[in-house]
Regions:
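Short alpha-helical DNA-recognition segment
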Residues: 15-34
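Short, conserved catalytic or interaction motifs in soluble domains
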Residues: 37
Length: 54
């Protein structure tokens, strides 16, 4: 499982929407969707926030 599959699985397993996680990261939902699709690399600060959140 690569990182994009993992962040999606974590989000879905916890019943969170992309919008909720995007709000946590202070980004738009479309940007977060791009993270899950692998279209955009996740900045380190966002990875740290995700790790602390989950």
């Amino acid at each position: 499982m690569d990182y994009k599959e993992r962040i999606r699985a974590l989000r879905e397993d916890n019943d969170y929407t992309q919008s909720r996680i995007a709000g946590l990261l202070n980004i738009g939902q479309n940007t977060y969707a791009d993270y899950e699709l692998g279209k955009t690399r996740i900045p380190v600060d966002s990875l740290i926030k995700l790790a602390q959140f989950y």
